[in-house]
């Protein structure tokens, strides 16, 4: 069962609400501050970034502020509830000129080839509906040569990313593993 179908069931909706509460908890902000994690991913001004699985927007607003007016952030999620929540947060933060919030599929983003500086995948993997081979193929397609793929956590996907032949390992800081797109 995929994420979209899960969100239409009563247990699925309850699970999604519980996860949203956890994602927005003060504990998470205190011990897993989004700014520190984004800095470890190498987010900086003027970048063009895709956030896969934006969820509640925990990383979206801080990332947009770090990227600034010269860059752009596409916050993508499959769940309409997540998209609506993040759109409202972006509007309230006055960041609509930097952030595009969209409902979409990470396996088929419909973005242009080599159009992004970085893709961040934070807290999405391991999702059973995201086959790593197809996900990595799509991320490789949309990243510029030398573009960055940042994954937070888990570390066990490292082998899949390296064995794909599409990315080379850069480093791991504050739990964020970064990889460079290769031809």
Region annotations inferred by a language model:
Residues 28-45:
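Conserved alpha-helix/loop element of class I SAM-dependent methyltransferases that forms part
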Residues 79:
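Conserved SAM/SAH-binding beta-strand->alpha-helix loop
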Residues 95-106:
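Conserved SAM-binding strand-loop segment of SAM-dependent methyltransferases
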Residues 107-119:
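A short acidic, Gly/Pro-enriched loop at the edge of an enzyme's catalytic core
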Residues 117-131:
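A short SAM/SAH-binding and catalytic strip from SAM-dependent methyltransferases
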């Amino acid at each position: 069962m995929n994420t979209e179908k899960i969100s239409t069931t009563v247990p699925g909706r309850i699970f999604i609400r519980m996860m949203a509460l956890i994602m927005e908890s003060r504990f998470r902000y205190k011990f897993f501050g989004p700014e520190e994690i984004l800095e470890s991913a190498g987010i900086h001004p003027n970048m063009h970034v895709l956030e896969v699985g934006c969820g509640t927007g925990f990383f979206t607003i801080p990332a947009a502020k770090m990227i600034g007016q010269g860059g752009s952030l596409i916050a993508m999620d499959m769940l309409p509830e997540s998209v609506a929540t993040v759109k409202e947060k972006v509007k309230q933060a006055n960041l609509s000129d930097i952030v595009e919030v969209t409902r979409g599929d990470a396996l088929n983003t419909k973005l242009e080839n080599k159009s992004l500086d970085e893709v961040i995948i934070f807290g999405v993997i391991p999702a059973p509906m995201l086959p790593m081979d197809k996900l990595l193929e799509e991320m490789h397609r949309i990243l510029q040569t030398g573009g960055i793929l940042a994954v937070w956590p888990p570390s066990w996907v490292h082998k899949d990313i390296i064995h794909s032949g599409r990315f080379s390992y850069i480093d791991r800081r504050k739990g964020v593993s970064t990889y460079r797109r290769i031809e």
